[in-house]
């Protein structure tokens, strides 16, 4: 609560200082006080702070780049985009929900999603959506800065959870376990809805990434990647040499008519 009050106050003070400095530089100190520019400075700073915080809160609610896309009409017409898509699922969530109860399980999920947000952002990922106990992460191919990002983000998330071991054990009596599937392909991105508008992603790559993630449990793996995604990442000079790739060959995914080559990735 204190931080919610202090941060806007500091922002207002900083903007007021900069704005006052500009006025004094242009008009002189005497004119600044004489013509009551102090009130204008504070009022302008307050308005600017409110607008900046409002934008930040809405962007946090909608997701990175989504608000900008809606404001500028980037996706007013659906467009094709090449993206890496990861479905990351919390393992054993049904048992955890029964053990913790609805409210505490919600807090458990929220803690987990908050903890993994930073490594996702650090690796250039966009959190597209939370679906129950699952998070969908995407990288635009042209903005996926490093070949490390769609692969090593999984292991950085694991490191974050390990470091929070004591916290999760003390509060919930269990540690989050998770599995992920990564795929690459063309999605269709466009605005969807009227009363509640969002930028929606659709296409075969979304369904396939979800099916790859489902294969993790069947194959006793924690991270499976399609060879389509691996081959695209291997084209880059900075492909991480530290990862261990174990091929599972071509497999039949549930609900898919054609087979797909997948591999497990480990460090």
Features from the language model and the residues they span:
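Alpha-helical scaffold within the catalytic cores of cyclic-nucleotide enzymes
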Residues: 110-124, 141-180, 184, 204-213, ...
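Alpha-helix/helix-capping structural signal
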Residues: 91, 186-187, 228
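Cytosolic regulatory/linker segments at or just downstream of nucleotide-handling modules
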Residues: 218-267
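Hydrophobic transmembrane alpha-helices
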Residues: 1-34
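Regulatory cytosolic signal-relay segments
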Residues: 21-81
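Acidic/histidine metal-binding catalytic segments
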Residues: 131, 170-179, 222-229
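Short glycine-enriched, charge-decorated loop/helix-capping segments at active-site entrances
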Residues: 100-103, 195-199
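Catalytic NTP-binding/metal-coordinating core of nucleotidyl cyclase/transferase enzymes
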Residues: 77-152
């Amino acid at each position: 609560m204190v931080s919610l009050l202090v941060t806007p106050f500091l922002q207002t003070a900083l903007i007021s200082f900069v704005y006052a400095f500009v006025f004094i530089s242009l008009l002189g100190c005497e004119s600044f006080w004489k013509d009551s520019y102090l009130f204008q400075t504070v009022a302008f700073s307050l308005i600017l702070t409110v607008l900046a915080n409002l934008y930040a809160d809405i962007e946090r609610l909608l997701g990175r780049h989504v608000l900008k896309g809606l404001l500028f009409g980037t996706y007013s017409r659906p467009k094709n985009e090449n993206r890496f898509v990861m479905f990351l699922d919390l393992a054993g969530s049904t048992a955890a929900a029964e053990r913790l109860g609805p409210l505490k399980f919600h807090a458990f999920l929220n803690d987990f999603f908050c903890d993994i947000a930073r490594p996702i952002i650090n690796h250039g990922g966009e959190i597209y959506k939370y679906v129950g106990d699952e998070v969908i992460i995407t990288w635009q191919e042209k903005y996926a800065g490093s070949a490390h990002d769609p692969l090593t983000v999984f292991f950085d998330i694991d490191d974050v959870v390990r470091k929070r071991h004591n916290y999760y054990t003390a509060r919930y009596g269990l540690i989050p376990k998770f599995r992920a599937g990564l795929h690459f392909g063309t999605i269709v991105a466009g605005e969807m809805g009227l009363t509640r508008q969002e930028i929606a992603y659709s296409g075969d790559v979304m369904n396939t990434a979800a099916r790859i993630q489902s294969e993790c449990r069947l194959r006793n793996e924690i991270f499976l990647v399609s060879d389509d995604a691996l081959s695209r990442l291997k084209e880059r000079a900075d492909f991480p040499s530290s990862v261990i790739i174990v091929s599972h060959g071509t497999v039949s995914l549930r609900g898919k008519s054609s087979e797909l080559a997948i591999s497990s990735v480990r460090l």
